[in-house]
From Swiss-Prot:
Its main location: cytoplasm. It is an enzyme of class 2 (transferase). GO terms for biological process: CMP-keto-3-deoxy-D-manno-octulosonic acid biosynthetic process; lipopolysaccharide biosynthetic process. Pathway: Nucleotide-sugar biosynthesis; CMP-3-deoxy-D-manno-octulosonate biosynthesis; CMP-3-deoxy-D-manno-octulosonate from 3-deoxy-D-manno-octulosonate and CTP: step 1/1; Bacterial outer membrane biogenesis; lipopolysaccharide biosynthesis. Coiled coil: none annotated. This is 3-deoxy-manno-octulosonate cytidylyltransferase. Keywords: Cytoplasm, Lipopolysaccharide biosynthesis, Nucleotidyltransferase, Transferase. Belongs to the KdsB family. The keyword Transferase applies. Its EC number is 2.7.7.38.
Amino acid sequence: MSAAFTVVIPARYASTRLPGKPLQDIAGKPMVQHVWEQAKKSSASRVVVATDDARIVEACKVFGAEVLLTREDHNSGTDRLAEVATQLGLPADAIVVNVQGDEPLVPPSIIDQVAANLATNPQAGIATLAEPIEDVTALFNPNVVKVVADKSGLALTFSRAPLAWARDAFAKSRDVLPAGVPYRRHIGIYAYRAGFLHDFVAWGPCWLEDTECLEQLRALYNGVRIHVADALEAPAAGVDTAEDLERVRRLLGA
């Protein structure tokens, strides 16, 4: 039997690039509802939306989601999850899956996958997923987060910059992907144990996290191992910009 887990969907209203992002309409539903519906198709025992805004609370109540109002001053979605774990009274070994509130096309299969990967890799404090990068434009796009892992599938680092830097190949051209380099895009879905979430908050942000604006770097900086596997099913990219929103609307026939 697979381990039980809870999905938490952080949904923040004040997005820098797309204000009110969780409530943006896609095919007649707010974006956060699409994410919630996908999460409900997974094996999660519970799906909770966590937000800092009363407008999102009210929207979630309309479509029947369990929703918690959290503080507004969290540094990251993971900090928000720690508050949710406390509000829900989750034990330290409970598995919590963070499904980003801007991933309306997240496949339920990878929600189950990342939870199972954490359960079967006790050496890791976090589990997450990736997929191959096959487009050189994506490699140089700072909105596409890159990840490099060791031979055991444990992350070495994450960056918005190309990883690794193919010195000789890029000296000749940056228009094609270098042959033989396994570039991977990080997929922003995470599984944690509830006890880890409280450690994460206690550490506070580090300079590397603040520089890259990547919260998972706080864990690596503090010596926590992150398990990375290739996703069973590659999701479409999430919604960061107005252009992304229009792309998803087209995909869903809005």
